[in-house]
Structure formats: C-alpha cells, structure tokens
A protein has these predicted regions:
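Beta-strand-turn-beta hairpins that frame and shape the catalytic cleft
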Residues: 1-9, 95-101, 113-133, 240-243
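Active-site beta-strand/loop signature of hydrolases that rely on acidic residues for catalysis
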Residues: 7-13, 32-57, 130-134, 146, ...
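Catalytic-core segment of enzymes that process non-peptidic bonds
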Residues: 71-108
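Residues that flank catalytic or metal-binding motifs in active/ligand-binding sites
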Residues: 4, 88-90, 116-118, 127, ...
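N-terminal, active-site-proximal structural segment of metallo-dependent hydrolase catalytic domains
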Residues: 1-68, 75, 80-85, 227, ...
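Active-site environment of divalent metal-dependent phosphoester hydrolases
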Residues: 16-18, 51-57, 82-83, 139-142, ...
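Soluble or luminal CAZymes and related metallo-dependent hydrolases
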Residues: 20-28, 57, 112, 142-149, ...
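Metal-dependent phosphoester-hydrolase catalytic domains
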Residues: 99, 105-109, 121-123, 140, ...
Length: 243
C-alpha cells in the first residue's frame, strides 16, 4: 500500500500578543504568510486565536489567512463558540481543499478554564483520517481528565487513523499519564520538540501525534525572527503518513 503524507502545522498564537508585549493580529497573519504558507501545508491548527473572555470574539483575519495560505477555513457555526468567534474557544483549523470533510464535532473539555477541541473526519485519497486540534490545561490532573474525555469521544466514533495536534501543555519529554493508551483507547506517538518560550525554547508544549498506521516524520520548529516576535510559542510542523 502506498502511503501519502499530510503536512501539518500547529501554533499557539497567544491571542496575537507578541514577545514585545504588543497585541498585533496583523503580525501573526504576516508570520503565517511568510513562514508557514510557503511550506505547502495541508493542515494548519491555531490555538488562542479568539479572545479569552466571552463572547470569545475572533482576533485574526481568518479570510486573509485562508487566502495567503491556500487553505480553507472550515468553521461554520457548528464549529464556533458563538457568532462573534472564529473558532471553538480559540482553536481554529484550516484544511487543504483536497481534503473533503465527512464529519465534524466540537468537544467540551472539563476544567476551571473552559477548554475544547475541534475534531474533523476527512477523506484523504482512498481513506479516512481524523484530525483533532486542542489546547489542554496547565494542570496535569486536568490534562488527564481532558484526554480521557477525548478518548471517550473516540470510542463513540468509527475507527480510523487519528492525528492530534495543538498546545498540549505537557512539558515532560517522556510524556506522562495523559498519553496512556487506556485513556484514549489508542496509542498516539510523535517526536518531542522544544517550542516554548519562542525566544529561547525549553519546553515541548506543542505536539503533533498520530496513531498506527501513521508515522510523524520530519518534525521541526519554525524559528524565524518574525514568528518569534509574534507569539510566545513557536509553530511546529511535521509530515504524517496516512493511507
């Protein structure tokens, strides 16, 4: 069987607040245009891309991002927190037009700070792939509960290769209890790469993971000056083999 590859990127844009303390949404869009779009992405996941407080209004020009990247903004109202939001609690996904969406959900995650995930099932060539983007809690016990919630969702959905990407806030290189297969019902794997803080990366908070038969290849952090100024996280990019 010939395997295809999906090029995926994830970036916590810190609500457009740069390392200089300035809030500049256009700077984030420019960084995506100059540092991510040329990579030929199939999937772009953003976190902290809506305002933190209700009504979680959109911060970025998602139409401009779609135009510059060649990707499609996928969030109809069913995938947004509210009419003023661009995503679901700050999580936004853009997909290549070659990926046809077959099912989509938002997943409410427990915790004292409202968190969520966006799940898309897409047709890629002759097969189906599930893409989940999320931003997990800073608290390890809450991350475990949140991953269990995602696992309960997966058990209700048809079996298919799953890609999980986003700011998982897991700083331990060896992983942790949140990655145990019994929580998710599957074993997610991927490289560990330091991505935070952007000015001197020390912690591997941002992850791109997949389960069998997929493999995460060529993972790297994008550390251009423009990107490092735009957010306190670096974006990470990887290729994932899919059927």
């Amino acid at each position: 069987m010939t395997l295809q590859r999906l090029r995926c990127a994830t970036w916590n844009v810190h609500r457009a607040k740069g390392t200089d303390g300035l809030v500049d949404p256009e700077r984030v869009v420019q960084a995506i245009d100059h540092s991510l779009a040329p990579l030929g992405l199939d999937v772009l996941a953003l976190q902290e891309a809506d305002a933190e407080c209700r009504p979680h209004a959109g911060i970025l020009d998602v139409g401009d991002i779609a135009s510059r990247s060649g990707l499609e903004y996928v969030h109809d109202m069913s995938l947004r927190w509210g009419p003023e939001s661009d995503g679901f609690l700050g999580t936004i996904l853009f997909l290549s037009p070659t990926l046809r969406r077959t099912h989509a959900d938002v997943i409410d995650l427990p915790g004292h700070c409202h968190r969520g995930a966006v799940s898309l099932e897409v047709r890629c060539g002759s097969g189906l792939v599930r893409i989940i983007s999320t931003h997990l809690s800073l608290s390890q016990p809450l991350r475990i509960v949140q991953m269990r919630t995602i696992g309960q969702y997966l058990r209700r959905r048809p079996a298919m290769q799953t890609i999980l990407l986003g700011d998982l806030n897991e700083w331990r290189p060896w992983g942790g209890a949140m990655f145990r297969p019994r929580l998710l019902g599957t074993r997610l794997r991927g490289p560990v790469l330091r991505s935070f803080p952007s000015t001197r990366p020390l912690l591997p908070l941002d992850r791109i993971l997949t389960d069998a038969p997929g493999v995460v290849l060529g993972m790297r952090a994008i550390d251009t000056v423009e990107v490092a100024r735009a957010s306190d996280h670096l974006p990470v990019v990887a290729d994932i083999t899919v059927p």
